[in-house]
Amino acid sequence: MLKSRLLLSFLFLFTYSTVFSQNLVVQKPESNVPAPVSAAFAKKFPTSEPVWFSDYQGKYNQQLVYEGRFMYKNRNSSVIYEANGNLLAIVARVDQKELPKKILAYMNEKFSSFPIRDAALVTAQNNETTYEVGIIINETYVIKVFSEEGDFIKSIIG
C-alpha cells in the first residue's frame, strides 16, 4: 500500500513538473513555416539560414506573422513576414556608435541617466527606414523611434 502511494505521488509530481515546465517556454522555434514565407526569404537572403518563430501581432493580436532570425553581414537581424510571404519589416541590430549624431545628442540631452540597452535599424515594407533605441525607465522597457535623419518620431512602451 505504501509503495503504491509513493509511486502515485511520484507520478503526480513528475507529471505536474513536466506540464508546468512546458509553460515556462516563451517562444519555441517554428518548424511549419508556410512555403510562400520560406520562398520569399530565400529570394531576398539566399545565403542566410533563419530560425523561424511565429507570433500574433496587431491591435488585437489577430495577425499571424513569421519572424526569421539570422546573421546578415555580421549583424543579428530578423525579418517579419505575413503568412502569404508579404514582407512587413527587416530589423538589423546596430551598435550605439553607429547611430546618427542627432539621435545620440537627443538621447544625451533628454535621457542621459538611462543608458541605451540596444538599437536597431528598421526598414518597413514601404521602405521607410527608422532607428529604434531601447532604454529602461522605471523598470519599463521604452523604445524611442527616430527617422533615418535622426529626428524623434515617437515612444513605444514595450
Predicted segment positions?
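Bacterial Sec-dependent N-terminal signal peptides
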Residues: 1-27, 41
